[in-house]
Structure formats: C-alpha cells, structure tokens
Amino acid sequence: MIGRGVCCRSFHTAGSAWKQFGFPKTQVTTIYNKTKSASNYKGYLKHRDAPGMYYQPSESIATGSVNSETIPRSFMAASDPRRGLDMPVQSTKAKQCPNVLVGKSTVNGKTYHLGPQEIDEIRKLRLDNPQKYTRKFLAAKYGISPLFVSMVSKPSEQHVQIMESRLQEIQSRWKEKRRIAREDRKRRKLLWYQA
C-alpha cells in the first residue's frame, strides 16, 4: 500500500531477473528502521528520492513482471535483446471478452404471458385468502415478480388493518433510541428528493 501510493517505486528488488535484464534497482526506502517501522507511512513520505521515473510492475500481472509484453520499452535497458522484438498490439477479441453480466430479472427477458383471466384470478385469490396466497406464493405460481403481483392486486382491507396493528404492536416495544433512529431515517429519505 505504501509503495504504490507514495511514488512509483518497486517492491520487486530481490529477483535475479532485475540483475539479468539490467533494470535499475529501485527500493522502497524510509527514514525510519525498515523492520521495526515498516508500517509507519510517514517515513516513506518524508524520504527524498532521486528525481526520475521508476517502473513498478503490478503484483497482479499473470505473466510475471519480467515478461516483455508487460514491460514498456522505455523502461528496458538499451542493451536488452527484447527491445528489438515486435510488441503485440493489445487487441481484445470477442471470444476472449467475458459475457455481459445481466440482472436476475432480465436473464431470460421479460415475458408478457398473463391474460386478463389470470390477473382476475390473482386478484380473487389474494382477496379471498391473503395469508395463504401471499405475493411470493402467487409470483412463484404464475412465474411473475412479487412487484407485479402487488401492482395488479391489493389485499383485503381487513388484512391490511391486521398487518398495521401488528406493526404498531412491534413499534410499541421499540426503545427510545431505535424510535429516534427510524424517525431520522424517514427525514433523511424525504431529503433525497429535495435537491
């Protein structure tokens, strides 16, 4: 973390590849003791390096940091034999690219398979027995989303009152801290749309 953010210096100094290919030996240096104060970022910030550019390969390179395809030509030594090689152009082919990720609801695309009879049946079932025929149950039965079920049908007034009374009972057991937090949340939600 420290080496990447402070300056373009490399942690990769101990490898034989650096000596073999003549890369400049760069080291992350600090003004403090390296072993005892390695996590103290202030030492890395206060240290003054010689001006210039330092090549720091990414730790996540799959092919390794000594591969000629990943090292820019400007950072290769003048005597490096790989400098004369033709570098392949990074062209992404459609076969190599991953598929575009899609949401769960749009994997198979939207379907408009319900007719007026099915929608009337959904309304009737939800009005008759909302305890058994919940939105989730009806959505699974007809292959639609629970949101669509709530759009085309409403539960009975009696069921709505029962659910509201249950909610009031739960909220009556809330402590003062939770009640204040929920009120603050409601106020913040109102501010979302007042820009």
Swiss-Prot record:
Q: Which GO terms describe its biological process?
A: mitochondrial translation
Q: Which UniProt keywords apply?
A: Mitochondrion, Ribonucleoprotein, Ribosomal protein, Transit peptide
Localization, UniProt? Mitochondrion
> Which molecular-function annotations from GO does this UniProt entry contain?
structural constituent of ribosome
A cellular component annotation (GO) from this entry: mitochondrial inner membrane
Which family is this sequence assigned to?
Belongs to the mitochondrion-specific ribosomal protein mL58 family.
The role this protein plays is: Component of the mitochondrial ribosome (mitoribosome), a dedicated translation machinery responsible for the synthesis of mitochondrial genome-encoded proteins, including at least some of the essential transmembrane subunits of the mitochondrial respiratory chain. The mitoribosomes are attached to the mitochondrial inner membrane and translation products are cotranslationally integrated into the membrane.
* Other known facts: Present with 350 molecules/cell in log phase SD medium.
Q: What is this protein called?
A: Large ribosomal subunit protein mL58
Organism of origin: Saccharomyces cerevisiae (strain ATCC 204508 / S288c)
| Gene (UniProt) | MRPL20
